[in-house]
UniProtKB/Swiss-Prot annotation:
UniProt function note: Alpha subunit of the heteropentameric ligand-gated chloride channel gated by gamma-aminobutyric acid (GABA), a major inhibitory neurotransmitter in the brain. GABA-gated chloride channels, also named GABA(A) receptors (GABAAR), consist of five subunits arranged around a central pore and contain GABA active binding site(s) located at the alpha and beta subunit interface(s). When activated by GABA, GABAARs selectively allow the flow of chloride anions across the cell membrane down their electrochemical gradient.
Gene that encodes it: Gabra3
InterPro entries: GABAA/Glycine_rcpt (IPR006028), GABAAa_rcpt (IPR001390), GABBAa3_rcpt (IPR005433), Gabra-1-6_TM (IPR047024), Neur_chan_lig-bd (IPR006202), Neur_chan_lig-bd_sf (IPR036734), Neur_channel (IPR006201), Neuro-gated_channel_TM_sf (IPR036719)
Positions contributing to 4-aminobutanoate binding: 119, 182
Residue intervals annotated with topology Extracellular: 29-274, 326-336, 479-492
Domains (record comment): GABAARs subunits share a common topological structure: a peptide sequence made up of a long extracellular N-terminal, four transmembrane domains, intracellular or cytoplasmic domain located between the third and the fourth transmembrane domains.
Major localization class: membrane
Full protein name: Gamma-aminobutyric acid receptor subunit alpha-3
Subcellular location: Postsynaptic cell membrane; Cell membrane
Amino acid sequence: MIITQMWHFYVTRVVLLLLISILPGTTSQGESRRQEPGDFVKQDIGGLSPKHAPDIPDDSTDNITIFTRILDRLLDGYDNRLRPGLGDAVTEVKTDIYVTSFGPVSDTDMEYTIDVFFRQTWHDERLKFDGPMKILPLNNLLASKIWTPDTFFHNGKKSVAHNMTTPNKLLRLVDNGTLLYTMRLTIHAECPMHLEDFPMDVHACPLKFGSYAYTKAEVIYSWTLGKNKSVEVAQDGSRLNQYDLLGHVVGTEIIRSSTGEYVVMTTHFHLKRKIGYFVIQTYLPCIMTVILSQVSFWLNRESVPARTVFGVTTVLTMTTLSISARNSLPKVAYATAMDWFIAVCYAFVFSALIEFATVNYFTKRSWAWEGKKVPEALEMKKKTPAAPTKKNTTFNIVGTTYPINLAKDTEFSTISKSAAAPSASSTPTAIASPKATYVQDSPAETKTYNSVSKVDKISRIIFPVLFAIFNLVYWATYVNRESAIKGMIRKQ
Protein backbone atom coordinates (compact mmCIF):
# COMPACT_ATOMS: atom_id res chain seq x y z
CA MET A 1 0.00 0.00 0.00
CA ILE A 2 2.70 2.39 0.93
CA ILE A 3 4.66 1.49 -2.18
CA THR A 4 1.63 2.14 -4.36
CA GLN A 5 1.18 5.66 -2.87
CA MET A 6 4.82 6.59 -3.42
CA TRP A 7 4.59 5.42 -7.02
CA HIS A 8 1.56 7.65 -7.68
CA PHE A 9 3.38 10.64 -6.07
CA TYR A 10 6.36 10.35 -8.35
CA VAL A 11 4.21 9.84 -11.45
CA THR A 12 2.13 12.90 -10.63
CA ARG A 13 5.24 15.00 -10.12
CA VAL A 14 6.72 13.93 -13.42
CA VAL A 15 3.48 14.77 -15.24
CA LEU A 16 3.36 18.23 -13.67
CA LEU A 17 6.94 18.95 -14.70
CA LEU A 18 6.16 17.89 -18.25
CA LEU A 19 3.10 20.16 -18.35
CA ILE A 20 5.09 23.17 -17.05
CA SER A 21 7.83 22.69 -19.64
CA ILE A 22 5.44 22.70 -22.59
CA LEU A 23 3.33 25.76 -21.56
CA PRO A 24 3.95 29.08 -23.79
CA GLY A 25 5.67 32.23 -22.37
CA THR A 26 7.85 30.25 -20.13
CA THR A 27 11.63 30.68 -20.13
CA SER A 28 14.54 28.70 -19.13
CA GLN A 29 16.49 29.37 -16.03
CA GLY A 30 19.33 31.10 -17.99
CA GLU A 31 16.85 33.53 -19.56
CA SER A 32 14.63 34.14 -16.59
CA ARG A 33 16.71 37.24 -15.46
CA ARG A 34 14.76 40.47 -15.73
CA GLN A 35 16.20 43.14 -18.14
CA GLU A 36 18.02 46.01 -16.46
CA PRO A 37 17.48 49.71 -17.42
CA GLY A 38 21.04 49.99 -18.53
CA ASP A 39 20.54 47.25 -21.04
CA PHE A 40 17.90 49.36 -22.76
CA VAL A 41 20.20 52.36 -23.09
CA LYS A 42 22.85 50.20 -24.58
CA GLN A 43 20.50 48.81 -27.12
CA ASP A 44 18.66 52.04 -27.95
CA ILE A 45 20.79 55.06 -28.79
CA GLY A 46 18.74 57.93 -30.16
CA GLY A 47 15.91 55.62 -30.95
CA LEU A 48 18.16 53.35 -32.97
CA SER A 49 19.68 50.06 -32.17
CA PRO A 50 23.47 49.80 -32.15
CA LYS A 51 23.46 48.06 -35.47
CA HIS A 52 21.66 51.08 -37.09
CA ALA A 53 23.56 53.97 -35.30
CA PRO A 54 25.80 56.26 -37.57
CA ASP A 55 29.55 55.72 -37.51
CA ILE A 56 31.61 58.52 -35.79
CA PRO A 57 34.53 59.71 -38.00
CA ASP A 58 37.83 59.09 -36.34
CA ASP A 59 40.15 61.03 -38.79
CA SER A 60 40.92 63.74 -36.25
CA THR A 61 41.62 61.18 -33.63
CA ASP A 62 43.83 59.34 -36.04
CA ASN A 63 45.81 62.55 -36.96
CA ILE A 64 46.32 63.43 -33.33
CA THR A 65 47.49 59.93 -32.63
CA ILE A 66 49.77 59.97 -35.65
CA PHE A 67 51.42 63.31 -34.84
CA THR A 68 51.68 62.45 -31.19
CA ARG A 69 53.66 59.40 -32.17
CA ILE A 70 55.69 61.51 -34.65
CA LEU A 71 56.58 64.11 -32.02
CA ASP A 72 57.39 61.45 -29.49
CA ARG A 73 59.66 59.80 -32.01
CA LEU A 74 61.30 63.14 -32.97
CA LEU A 75 61.91 64.19 -29.40
CA ASP A 76 63.06 60.75 -28.36
CA GLY A 77 66.80 61.15 -28.01
CA TYR A 78 66.70 64.82 -29.17
CA ASP A 79 69.26 67.00 -27.36
CA ASN A 80 68.24 70.67 -27.40
CA ARG A 81 71.65 71.65 -26.08
CA LEU A 82 73.26 70.95 -29.44
CA ARG A 83 72.73 73.16 -32.46
CA PRO A 84 71.68 71.64 -35.81
CA GLY A 85 74.57 70.50 -37.96
CA LEU A 86 77.05 70.50 -35.12
CA GLY A 87 80.49 69.57 -36.45
CA ASP A 88 79.30 69.38 -40.08
CA ALA A 89 77.84 72.68 -41.26
CA VAL A 90 77.13 76.23 -40.17
CA THR A 91 73.60 76.88 -38.96
CA GLU A 92 71.93 79.67 -40.95
CA VAL A 93 69.21 81.67 -39.22
CA LYS A 94 67.02 83.77 -41.52
CA THR A 95 65.28 86.72 -39.92
CA ASP A 96 62.76 89.41 -40.77
CA ILE A 97 60.98 92.07 -38.72
CA TYR A 98 57.51 93.59 -38.89
CA VAL A 99 57.28 96.85 -36.93
CA THR A 100 53.82 97.41 -35.48
CA SER A 101 54.64 100.67 -33.68
CA PHE A 102 57.65 102.98 -33.51
CA GLY A 103 58.08 105.48 -30.71
CA PRO A 104 58.21 107.42 -28.57
CA VAL A 105 61.77 108.79 -28.72
CA SER A 106 63.41 110.26 -25.61
CA ASP A 107 65.97 113.01 -26.24
CA THR A 108 67.14 113.23 -22.65
CA ASP A 109 67.76 109.47 -22.34
CA MET A 110 68.74 109.03 -26.01
CA GLU A 111 66.59 105.95 -26.50
CA TYR A 112 63.53 104.87 -28.44
CA THR A 113 60.79 102.25 -28.10
CA ILE A 114 59.78 99.82 -30.84
CA ASP A 115 57.14 97.06 -30.91
CA VAL A 116 57.89 94.27 -33.41
CA PHE A 117 57.04 90.79 -34.59
CA PHE A 118 60.45 89.13 -34.67
CA ARG A 119 60.66 86.09 -36.96
CA GLN A 120 63.44 83.50 -37.21
CA THR A 121 63.72 80.54 -39.57
CA TRP A 122 66.30 77.74 -39.51
CA HIS A 123 66.70 74.11 -40.60
CA ASP A 124 67.07 71.17 -38.23
CA GLU A 125 67.65 67.77 -39.86
CA ARG A 126 66.69 65.98 -36.66
CA LEU A 127 63.08 67.19 -36.94
CA LYS A 128 62.21 65.79 -40.36
CA PHE A 129 58.97 63.81 -40.43
CA ASP A 130 56.58 62.09 -42.82
CA GLY A 131 52.90 62.54 -42.09
CA PRO A 132 49.50 63.52 -43.51
CA MET A 133 50.28 67.26 -43.06
CA LYS A 134 53.19 69.17 -44.56
CA ILE A 135 53.22 72.01 -42.00
CA LEU A 136 52.64 71.20 -38.38
CA PRO A 137 51.57 74.10 -36.09
CA LEU A 138 52.98 73.51 -32.65
CA ASN A 139 52.37 74.90 -29.22
CA ASN A 140 54.87 77.44 -27.91
CA LEU A 141 55.72 75.06 -25.06
CA LEU A 142 57.55 72.87 -27.53
CA ALA A 143 60.06 75.67 -28.09
CA SER A 144 61.66 74.82 -24.76
CA LYS A 145 62.24 71.23 -25.88
CA ILE A 146 64.08 71.97 -29.13
CA TRP A 147 67.12 74.04 -30.04
CA THR A 148 66.39 77.74 -30.70
CA PRO A 149 68.84 80.54 -31.63
CA ASP A 150 70.27 82.54 -28.73
CA THR A 151 69.46 85.87 -30.38
CA PHE A 152 69.84 89.06 -28.36
CA PHE A 153 69.74 92.81 -29.13
CA HIS A 154 73.13 94.49 -28.86
CA ASN A 155 71.82 98.02 -28.21
CA GLY A 156 68.73 96.99 -26.28
CA LYS A 157 68.32 98.50 -22.83
CA LYS A 158 65.21 96.50 -22.02
CA SER A 159 63.24 93.95 -24.03
CA VAL A 160 59.86 92.55 -23.05
CA ALA A 161 58.22 89.41 -24.49
CA HIS A 162 54.43 89.70 -24.28
CA ASN A 163 52.69 86.96 -22.32
CA MET A 164 49.02 88.03 -22.22
CA THR A 165 46.85 86.09 -22.37
CA THR A 166 49.37 83.42 -23.31
CA PRO A 167 52.97 83.80 -24.48
CA ASN A 168 52.81 85.59 -27.84
CA LYS A 169 54.90 83.02 -29.67
CA LEU A 170 54.37 80.97 -32.80
CA LEU A 171 56.17 77.76 -33.76
CA ARG A 172 55.70 75.87 -37.01
CA LEU A 173 57.48 72.76 -38.21
CA VAL A 174 57.74 71.83 -41.90
CA ASP A 175 58.17 68.19 -42.89
CA ASN A 176 61.68 68.87 -44.23
CA GLY A 177 62.87 70.01 -40.79
CA THR A 178 62.49 73.80 -41.30
CA LEU A 179 61.20 75.73 -38.29
CA LEU A 180 59.51 79.15 -38.08
CA TYR A 181 59.72 80.83 -34.69
CA THR A 182 57.90 84.15 -34.19
CA MET A 183 57.50 86.24 -31.07
CA ARG A 184 56.14 89.67 -30.21
CA LEU A 185 58.64 91.97 -28.49
CA THR A 186 58.75 95.50 -27.12
CA ILE A 187 62.32 96.80 -27.22
CA HIS A 188 63.83 99.88 -25.58
CA ALA A 189 67.00 100.52 -27.56
CA GLU A 190 69.75 103.12 -27.48
CA CYS A 191 69.78 105.85 -30.10
CA PRO A 192 73.01 107.89 -30.13
CA MET A 193 72.18 111.49 -31.02
CA HIS A 194 74.37 114.30 -32.30
CA LEU A 195 72.58 117.52 -31.47
CA GLU A 196 74.79 120.06 -33.24
CA ASP A 197 71.94 120.83 -35.67
CA PHE A 198 69.15 120.81 -33.09
CA PRO A 199 66.25 121.38 -33.77
CA MET A 200 66.89 120.79 -37.50
CA ASP A 201 68.67 117.54 -36.71
CA VAL A 202 68.36 114.10 -38.34
CA HIS A 203 69.15 110.89 -36.47
CA ALA A 204 69.70 107.25 -37.42
CA CYS A 205 68.47 105.04 -34.57
CA PRO A 206 69.95 101.53 -34.90
CA LEU A 207 68.49 98.15 -34.03
CA LYS A 208 71.23 95.52 -33.79
CA PHE A 209 70.83 91.83 -33.01
CA GLY A 210 72.80 88.61 -33.36
CA SER A 211 73.90 85.44 -31.60
CA TYR A 212 75.16 85.77 -28.07
CA ALA A 213 77.41 82.67 -27.89
CA TYR A 214 77.85 81.30 -31.41
CA THR A 215 80.52 82.84 -33.63
CA LYS A 216 80.18 83.19 -37.38
CA ALA A 217 81.88 79.79 -37.76
CA GLU A 218 78.88 78.18 -36.04
CA VAL A 219 75.81 80.37 -36.61
CA ILE A 220 75.28 83.04 -39.24
CA TYR A 221 72.32 85.35 -39.78
CA SER A 222 70.75 86.52 -43.02
CA TRP A 223 67.66 88.44 -44.14
CA THR A 224 64.77 86.24 -45.24
CA LEU A 225 63.48 88.50 -48.04
CA GLY A 226 66.63 90.45 -48.82
CA LYS A 227 67.64 93.86 -47.57
CA ASN A 228 64.75 95.72 -49.19
CA LYS A 229 61.78 93.76 -47.83
CA SER A 230 62.94 92.02 -44.67
CA VAL A 231 62.05 94.98 -42.43
CA GLU A 232 58.57 96.42 -42.81
CA VAL A 233 56.94 99.24 -40.85
CA ALA A 234 53.17 99.40 -40.51
CA GLN A 235 51.60 102.42 -42.19
CA ASP A 236 49.89 103.51 -38.99
CA GLY A 237 52.76 102.40 -36.78
CA SER A 238 54.31 105.79 -36.07
CA ARG A 239 53.97 106.97 -32.47
CA LEU A 240 56.16 110.03 -32.91
CA ASN A 241 55.13 113.55 -31.87
CA GLN A 242 58.37 115.42 -32.52
CA TYR A 243 59.82 113.34 -35.37
CA ASP A 244 59.06 112.15 -38.88
CA LEU A 245 60.13 108.61 -39.81
CA LEU A 246 61.91 109.10 -43.14
CA GLY A 247 62.76 105.44 -43.75
CA HIS A 248 65.12 102.67 -42.75
CA VAL A 249 68.31 101.09 -44.04
CA VAL A 250 69.08 97.38 -43.53
CA GLY A 251 72.56 95.89 -43.36
CA THR A 252 74.90 93.30 -41.90
CA GLU A 253 78.04 93.77 -39.83
CA ILE A 254 80.84 91.65 -38.42
CA ILE A 255 82.01 92.57 -34.94
CA ARG A 256 85.19 91.27 -33.36
CA SER A 257 85.70 90.57 -29.69
CA SER A 258 88.02 88.54 -27.51
CA THR A 259 85.78 85.48 -27.95
CA GLY A 260 85.63 85.58 -31.75
CA GLU A 261 83.82 87.19 -34.67
CA TYR A 262 80.04 87.50 -34.67
CA VAL A 263 77.47 88.31 -37.33
CA VAL A 264 75.29 91.30 -36.40
CA MET A 265 72.14 92.28 -38.26
CA THR A 266 71.49 96.04 -38.32
CA THR A 267 68.55 98.27 -39.16
CA HIS A 268 68.86 102.06 -38.99
CA PHE A 269 65.64 104.06 -38.66
CA HIS A 270 66.12 107.63 -39.94
CA LEU A 271 64.26 110.30 -38.00
CA LYS A 272 63.78 114.00 -38.81
CA ARG A 273 62.77 116.32 -36.00
CA LYS A 274 59.67 118.47 -36.48
CA ILE A 275 60.61 122.11 -36.02
CA GLY A 276 57.11 123.56 -35.57
CA TYR A 277 57.09 123.25 -31.80
CA PHE A 278 60.43 125.03 -31.42
CA VAL A 279 59.47 127.81 -33.83
CA ILE A 280 56.49 128.64 -31.64
CA GLN A 281 58.23 128.15 -28.30
CA THR A 282 61.68 129.63 -28.96
CA TYR A 283 62.38 131.14 -32.37
CA LEU A 284 59.41 133.50 -32.66
CA PRO A 285 59.78 134.81 -29.07
CA CYS A 286 63.48 135.46 -29.69
CA ILE A 287 62.79 137.32 -32.93
CA MET A 288 60.04 139.41 -31.34
CA THR A 289 62.30 140.24 -28.39
CA VAL A 290 65.04 141.50 -30.71
CA ILE A 291 62.54 143.63 -32.64
CA LEU A 292 61.21 145.02 -29.37
CA SER A 293 64.71 145.99 -28.27
CA GLN A 294 65.18 147.98 -31.49
CA VAL A 295 62.05 150.05 -30.81
CA SER A 296 64.12 152.06 -28.32
CA PHE A 297 66.08 153.57 -31.23
CA TRP A 298 62.93 155.48 -32.20
CA LEU A 299 62.49 157.04 -28.76
CA ASN A 300 64.15 160.37 -28.07
CA ARG A 301 67.41 160.27 -26.24
CA GLU A 302 66.02 162.20 -23.29
CA SER A 303 63.53 159.35 -22.48
CA VAL A 304 65.91 157.64 -20.13
CA PRO A 305 63.38 155.58 -18.10
CA ALA A 306 61.56 154.23 -21.15
CA ARG A 307 64.69 153.20 -23.00
CA THR A 308 66.17 151.67 -19.86
CA VAL A 309 63.06 149.56 -19.33
CA PHE A 310 63.19 148.38 -22.95
CA GLY A 311 66.82 147.34 -22.65
CA VAL A 312 66.69 145.59 -19.29
CA THR A 313 63.39 143.81 -20.00
CA THR A 314 64.53 142.39 -23.33
CA VAL A 315 67.83 141.19 -21.84
CA LEU A 316 66.03 139.36 -19.04
CA THR A 317 63.56 137.88 -21.52
CA MET A 318 66.36 136.47 -23.65
CA THR A 319 67.98 134.99 -20.56
CA THR A 320 64.74 133.20 -19.65
CA LEU A 321 64.28 131.87 -23.18
CA SER A 322 67.83 130.51 -23.31
CA ILE A 323 67.34 128.63 -20.04
CA SER A 324 63.96 127.14 -20.98
CA ALA A 325 65.25 126.00 -24.39
CA ARG A 326 67.82 123.76 -22.70
CA ASN A 327 65.41 121.98 -20.38
CA SER A 328 64.24 119.48 -23.02
CA LEU A 329 67.78 118.51 -24.07
CA PRO A 330 70.48 116.35 -22.53
CA LYS A 331 73.35 118.24 -20.99
CA VAL A 332 75.75 118.14 -23.92
CA ALA A 333 79.07 119.97 -23.85
CA TYR A 334 78.71 121.59 -27.28
CA ALA A 335 76.46 124.33 -28.65
CA THR A 336 73.44 123.44 -30.76
CA ALA A 337 71.98 125.39 -33.66
CA MET A 338 69.33 126.81 -31.34
CA ASP A 339 72.03 127.88 -28.87
CA TRP A 340 73.77 129.85 -31.62
CA PHE A 341 70.52 131.53 -32.63
CA ILE A 342 69.71 132.48 -29.04
CA ALA A 343 73.27 133.74 -28.50
CA VAL A 344 73.10 136.02 -31.55
CA CYS A 345 69.67 137.31 -30.50
CA TYR A 346 71.06 137.94 -27.03
CA ALA A 347 73.95 139.88 -28.58
CA PHE A 348 71.53 142.09 -30.56
CA VAL A 349 69.45 142.80 -27.46
CA PHE A 350 72.47 143.56 -25.30
CA SER A 351 73.97 145.75 -28.04
CA ALA A 352 70.78 147.81 -28.12
CA LEU A 353 71.15 148.47 -24.40
CA ILE A 354 74.83 149.40 -24.82
CA GLU A 355 73.90 151.73 -27.70
CA PHE A 356 71.50 153.65 -25.50
CA ALA A 357 74.11 153.93 -22.75
CA THR A 358 76.55 155.35 -25.30
CA VAL A 359 74.04 157.88 -26.63
CA ASN A 360 73.04 158.94 -23.14
CA TYR A 361 76.67 159.40 -22.08
CA PHE A 362 77.85 161.51 -25.02
CA THR A 363 74.71 163.61 -25.40
CA LYS A 364 74.01 166.75 -23.29
CA ARG A 365 70.69 166.48 -21.53
CA SER A 366 70.29 170.25 -21.25
CA TRP A 367 68.87 173.39 -22.83
CA ALA A 368 72.30 174.90 -23.51
CA TRP A 369 72.96 177.28 -26.38
CA GLU A 370 73.88 175.45 -29.54
CA GLY A 371 77.40 176.27 -30.68
CA LYS A 372 78.17 178.58 -27.73
CA LYS A 373 79.14 178.07 -24.16
CA VAL A 374 77.35 179.75 -21.28
CA PRO A 375 80.30 181.96 -20.22
CA GLU A 376 80.42 183.38 -23.77
CA ALA A 377 76.74 184.29 -23.59
CA LEU A 378 77.24 186.05 -20.27
CA GLU A 379 80.14 188.11 -21.67
CA MET A 380 77.98 189.25 -24.58
CA LYS A 381 75.33 190.32 -22.11
CA LYS A 382 77.84 192.43 -20.13
CA LYS A 383 79.07 194.23 -23.27
CA THR A 384 75.55 195.37 -24.20
CA PRO A 385 75.18 199.19 -23.46
CA ALA A 386 72.88 199.92 -20.52
CA ALA A 387 70.64 202.94 -19.93
CA PRO A 388 71.99 205.80 -17.68
CA THR A 389 68.98 205.48 -15.46
CA LYS A 390 68.84 203.51 -12.32
CA LYS A 391 69.75 199.94 -12.86
CA ASN A 392 66.72 197.74 -12.99
CA THR A 393 67.03 194.02 -12.57
CA THR A 394 63.73 193.21 -14.20
CA PHE A 395 62.53 192.84 -17.79
CA ASN A 396 59.10 193.00 -19.27
CA ILE A 397 57.61 190.36 -21.57
CA VAL A 398 54.09 190.93 -22.85
CA GLY A 399 53.38 193.50 -20.16
CA THR A 400 54.64 191.33 -17.31
CA THR A 401 57.71 192.09 -15.25
CA TYR A 402 60.16 189.20 -14.52
CA PRO A 403 63.40 189.35 -12.52
CA ILE A 404 66.55 188.31 -14.28
CA ASN A 405 68.08 185.32 -12.55
CA LEU A 406 71.60 184.64 -13.72
CA ALA A 407 71.93 181.70 -11.41
CA LYS A 408 69.52 179.76 -13.60
CA ASP A 409 71.60 180.62 -16.66
CA THR A 410 74.60 178.97 -15.11
CA GLU A 411 72.55 175.81 -14.72
CA PHE A 412 71.90 175.55 -18.47
CA SER A 413 68.24 176.67 -18.32
CA THR A 414 67.00 178.04 -21.67
CA ILE A 415 63.84 178.89 -23.46
CA SER A 416 62.41 176.12 -25.59
CA LYS A 417 61.85 176.42 -29.28
CA SER A 418 58.14 176.70 -28.82
CA ALA A 419 58.55 179.70 -26.54
CA ALA A 420 61.22 181.36 -28.65
CA ALA A 421 59.11 181.63 -31.78
CA PRO A 422 56.32 183.85 -30.42
CA SER A 423 58.87 186.01 -28.59
CA ALA A 424 60.63 186.80 -31.85
CA SER A 425 57.43 187.83 -33.60
CA SER A 426 56.16 190.10 -30.81
CA THR A 427 56.24 193.92 -31.01
CA PRO A 428 59.29 195.81 -29.70
CA THR A 429 57.20 197.46 -27.02
CA ALA A 430 56.12 194.10 -25.75
CA ILE A 431 59.59 192.68 -25.66
CA ALA A 432 61.72 195.27 -23.93
CA SER A 433 61.24 198.16 -21.57
CA PRO A 434 63.30 201.38 -21.73
CA LYS A 435 64.20 200.76 -18.15
CA ALA A 436 65.96 197.46 -18.87
CA THR A 437 68.21 195.85 -21.40
CA TYR A 438 67.45 192.28 -22.57
CA VAL A 439 69.73 190.26 -24.76
CA GLN A 440 67.86 187.88 -27.13
CA ASP A 441 69.34 185.49 -29.61
CA SER A 442 67.82 184.41 -32.88
CA PRO A 443 65.81 181.17 -33.00
CA ALA A 444 68.66 179.49 -34.86
CA GLU A 445 70.88 179.90 -31.81
CA THR A 446 68.43 178.13 -29.44
CA LYS A 447 68.94 174.44 -28.73
CA THR A 448 66.08 172.20 -29.86
CA TYR A 449 64.19 169.77 -27.57
CA ASN A 450 63.64 166.07 -28.59
CA SER A 451 66.70 166.12 -30.78
CA VAL A 452 67.76 162.82 -32.41
CA SER A 453 71.24 161.43 -31.95
CA LYS A 454 73.23 160.47 -35.02
CA VAL A 455 74.00 157.14 -33.34
CA ASP A 456 70.27 156.42 -33.09
CA LYS A 457 69.77 157.29 -36.74
CA ILE A 458 72.49 154.87 -37.79
CA SER A 459 71.25 152.14 -35.43
CA ARG A 460 67.74 152.31 -36.90
CA ILE A 461 69.19 151.02 -40.16
CA ILE A 462 72.19 148.93 -39.14
CA PHE A 463 70.52 146.74 -36.49
CA PRO A 464 67.48 145.57 -38.55
CA VAL A 465 69.60 144.97 -41.65
CA LEU A 466 72.18 142.90 -39.79
CA PHE A 467 69.48 140.86 -38.03
CA ALA A 468 67.70 140.18 -41.33
CA ILE A 469 70.97 139.04 -42.95
CA PHE A 470 71.67 136.74 -40.02
CA ASN A 471 68.23 135.10 -40.29
CA LEU A 472 68.62 134.67 -44.04
CA VAL A 473 71.99 132.92 -43.69
CA TYR A 474 70.87 130.85 -40.70
CA TRP A 475 67.71 129.41 -42.22
CA ALA A 476 69.19 128.95 -45.69
CA THR A 477 72.08 126.93 -44.27
CA TYR A 478 69.99 124.48 -42.28
CA VAL A 479 67.20 124.10 -44.83
CA ASN A 480 69.72 123.14 -47.53
CA ARG A 481 71.40 120.69 -45.17
CA GLU A 482 68.05 119.05 -44.40
CA SER A 483 67.27 118.60 -48.11
CA ALA A 484 70.67 117.00 -48.72
CA ILE A 485 70.18 114.52 -45.87
CA LYS A 486 66.71 113.51 -47.11
CA GLY A 487 68.09 112.91 -50.60
CA MET A 488 70.87 110.72 -49.25
CA ILE A 489 68.39 108.60 -47.27
CA ARG A 490 66.17 108.07 -50.32
CA LYS A 491 69.16 106.86 -52.34
CA GLN A 492 70.08 104.36 -49.64
